[in-house]
Design a protein with these regions (language model features):
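Short, low-structural-confidence N-terminal segments
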Residues: 1-87, 91, 300-334
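Charged, solvent-exposed helices and adjacent loops that form client-binding or oligomerization surfaces
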Residues: 63-92, 108-177, 191-195, 203-204
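Surface-exposed patches in mature extracellular/periplasmic domains of secreted proteins
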Residues: 111-118, 207-212, 247-250
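Proteostasis/folding factors centered on peptidyl-prolyl cis-trans isomerases
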Residues: 139-187, 214, 232-275, 318-334
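Peptidyl-prolyl cis-trans isomerase
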Residues: 197-234, 263, 267-272
Length: 334
C-alpha cells in the first residue's frame, strides 16, 4: 500500500471508529438473562429487539478489514495481557449492536420513525453494499439484501432518536464560558528551581519562550485550553493573566509551573470550544434518558453462540465498506 493510500485508509478508519463510537456503549445496569428461549442464530435479544449472527458478522468483519487495511493482519496478535485485540474487538461489536437495539426500542417508545425518504436511502444503501459482496462474502456472512437494509434502517433510526432527544438542548454558550487562553508554560519538579527560573523569566529582555524551551521538563511549551480542561490551580492562574503577563510559581499535582499569557481570547478556538460544549451538553442529556430507559430492559445472551464467534480469515472475504456506504447515503446528504 502506498503512503497516500495508507493515509486515506487511516482517515477513513478514524471516521468509521468515530461514527461507531458515537453510538457505542452498553449500560452496566442492564438485566442479563442467559439463553432463555432464544432462536438458534440469535446472539442476543433485548426486550423485543433481536440481534442475529449475520448482523454480528457484518460489523465484526467490516471493522476487522478496516483495521487490517491500515495495520496488517498481524494486528490481532496484540494483547493487553488479559484479552487479545480480537477479543476486545468482538466485545466492542457486541456493545455497539446492543446500543443500537436499545436506541431503536427507545425510538418506538418516543414514536420516532424513519420517513419514506429515509427508508429509500436505507434501501439504496442496502442494495449498494449487498451488490458489492462477492459470493464468498455472502456465504461467509450469511446475509441477504433485506437484512443489510434492515441494519441500515436501525442505524439511521438510532441516530434519529438521538437527534430528537438532543434537539432542545440549549445551544447558547457565552464567550466567557467557552473562552480559550493560550500560554507559554514552564514546568519543573523542584520548588527551588522554579523560583530560580521565575527570577530569570522576569528579568528585562528575557525571551520567555526560549527560556521555557531550555528549562521546562515538558517538550510542548505553548498550550491552549479552556475552562475545566486543566487542574484548577493552573486554570485560575492562567485566566487571571493579561496578555504578556507572567504568573508567579503555581504548584499543581507535585509540579511547579510558570505561565506567560500569549493570548486571552482566540476567536477560532473559542468558536470550536462552544461547539464542543454544546456536544457535551447533548451527550449528557441523551445519556440521562438512555440510561433510565435501558435499566428497565432485560437482555438475553446466547452465551454458547457468542463464544463461538470468531473473525473470518479468508483471502476472498475483504469487505470493508458497510459503514462507508452508510455515511455516503445519510451523513453526506444532511
Amino acid at each position: 500500500m502506498c503512503i497516500r493510500d495508507s493515509c486515506k485508509a487511516a482517515a477513513l478508519l478514524g471516521a468509521v471508529v468515530m461514527m461507531i463510537s458515537a453510538l457505542a456503549g452498553c449500560g452496566k445496569n442492564t438485566k442479563v438473562v442467559l439463553t432463555a428461549g432464544l432462536k438458534k442464530n440469535e446472539v442476543f435479544r433485548i426486550s423485543s429487539a433481536s440481534c442475529v449472527l449475520p448482523e454480528v458478522m457484518v460489523y465484526l468483519t467490516n471493522m476487522q478489514n478496516q483495521y487490517e487495511s491500515v495495520y496488517g493482519s498481524q494486528i490481532w496478535n496484540a494483547s493487553d495481557g488479559q484479552l487479545s485485540l480480537e477479543q476486545e474487538e468482538r466485545e466492542q461489536v457486541l456493545t455497539q449492536l446492543a446500543r443500537i437495539k436499545v436506541m431503536n426500542l427507545l425510538a418506538q417508545k418516543k414514536e420516532v420513525t424513519l420517513d419514506d425518504k429515509e427508508k429509500e436511502r436505507a434501501a439504496a444503501a442496502g442494495r449498494e453494499y449487498f451488490t458489492s459482496l462477492n459470493s464468498a462474502e455472502v456465504t461467509a456472512l450469511n446475509v441477504t439484501q433485506d437484512l443489510i437494509t434492515k441494519m441500515y434502517e436501525e442505524y439511521a433510526l438510532a441516530e434519529k432518536v438521538y437527534q430528537t432527544i438532543v434537539e432542545n438542548v440549549n445551544p447558547e454558550v457565552s464567550d466567557d464560558e467557552a473562552r480559550t487562553i493560550t500560554v507559554d508554560m514552564i514546568r519543573v519538579s523542584d520548588s527551588a528551581k522554579a523560583s530560580q527560573v521565575l527570577g530569570k523569566a522576569k528579568e528585562e529582555g528575557v525571551d520567555f519562550e526560549t527560556l521555557a524551551q531550555a528549562e521546562s521538563e515538558d517538550q510542548t511549551v505553548t498550550q491552549s485550553f479552556g475552562k475545566g480542561e486543566v487542574p484548577e490551580a493552573l486554570e485560575k492562574a492562567a485566566f487571571n493573566l493579561g496578555k504578556d503577563e507572567i504568573s508567579d510559581v503555581v504548584e499543581s499535582d507535585g509540579s511547579y509551573y510558570i505561565l506567560k499569557c500569549i493570548s486571552t481570547f482566540d476567536e477560532a478556538q473559542t468558536k470550536a470550544n462552544k461547539e464542543k460544549i454544546v456536544k457535551q451538553r447533548q451527550s449528557e442529556a441523551f445519556d440521562t434518558e438512555y440510561t433510565a430507559f435501558e435499566q428497565t430492559l432485560v437482555r438475553q445472551l446466547n452465551e454458547e453462540l457468542w463464544n463461538s464467534v470468531t473473525m473470518i480469515h479468508q483471502d476472498d472475504v475483504k469487505t470493508s465498506s458497510f459503514f462507508e456506504v452508510y455515511q455516503m447515503y445519510f451523513q453526506h446528504q444532511e
